From Swiss-Prot:
It catalyses: orotidine 5'-phosphate + diphosphate = orotate + 5-phospho-alpha-D-ribose 1-diphosphate. The lineage of its organism: Eukaryota, Fungi, Dikarya, Ascomycota, Saccharomycotina. Catalyzes the transfer of a ribosyl phosphate group from 5-phosphoribose 1-diphosphate to orotate, leading to the formation of orotidine monophosphate (OMP). One of its GO terms (biological process) is 'de novo' UMP biosynthetic process. Belongs to the purine/pyrimidine phosphoribosyltransferase family. PyrE subfamily. This is Orotate phosphoribosyltransferase. Keywords: Glycosyltransferase, Pyrimidine biosynthesis, Transferase. CDD domains: PRTases_typeI (cd06223). It holds the Pfam family Pribosyltran.
């Protein structure tokens, strides 16, 4: 496992952003684990999140001009990742921009629904915590398109690697295939299973493996 993944997962368990047990999801499924990126709520935690996102982006080699964080959860992610990628990525990434959207457009002052860098004519990387139903990501694509830009990739913290309630594909697969862009992640369910070696009991780990086998995409 890459060092940035282990650092991220270590912190996720410390802050209880990644928990194990029995959790009812919005989909109605009962999951043996739960992830809430919002619990990375200190400066050092947020710095680790930004560094992890930055490392994923650098490793991928994806070309982009602007990091876009959909309101609201994506806003701090875009800002801290822009800062950390400038720190870790050298000159190539030193002037990458970031932006986010307002939930309601302003009709005074600077106006519009975008805060930060202009998107027009640029390659945009969308950053968010997870993709579940994909609704928030679809909205982000629409906003970016309406502002005259194109999406080069999506990067998320967690890929749950499970089917949606109405498709044999995962939400990540649906987004990637619908928009023809790569969807990158800091970690996925297989990483969680690997990470929990020696942390969870065999019974607890088996429940996660059974959940993966039941809901993993079959194509």
């Amino acid at each position: 496992m890459q060092a940035y993944k282990k650092d991220f997962l270590d912190l996720a368990t410390k802050y209880e952003a990644l928990k194990f047990g029995s959790f009812t999801l919005k989909s109605g499924r009962t999951s043996p684990y739960f992830f809430n990126l919002g619990l990375f709520n200190t400066g050092v935690a947020l710095s680790t999140v930004g560094a992890s996102f930055a490392q994923v982006i650098i490793n991928s080699g994806v070309e982009f001009d602007v990091i876009f964080g959909p309101a609201y959860k994506g806003i701090p992610l875009a800002a801290v990742t822009a800062a950390k990628i400038a720190e870790l990525g050298g000159e190539k990434y030193a002037t990458k921009e970031y932006a986010f959207n307002r939930k309601e457009a302003k009709d005074h002052g600077e106006g519009g629904n975008i805060v930060g860098a202009s998107l027009k004519g640029k390659k945009v990387l969308i950053i968010d915590d997870v993709i579940t139903a994909g609704t928030a990501i679809k909205e982000a694509f629409s906003i970016i398109d309406a502002n005259g830009a194109t999406v080069s990739a999506v990067v998320i913290a967690l890929d749950r690697q499970e089917t949606t309630v109405d498709s044999p594909k995962s939400a990540v697969q649906v987004v990637s295939q619908t928009y023809n862009v790569p969807v990158l992640n800091i970690f996925n369910l297989n990483d969680v299973i690997q990470y929990t070696d020696g942390i969870l009991t065999e019974d607890e780990k088996k429940k996660i493996e059974q959940y993966r086998d039941q809901y993993s995409p079959k194509e």
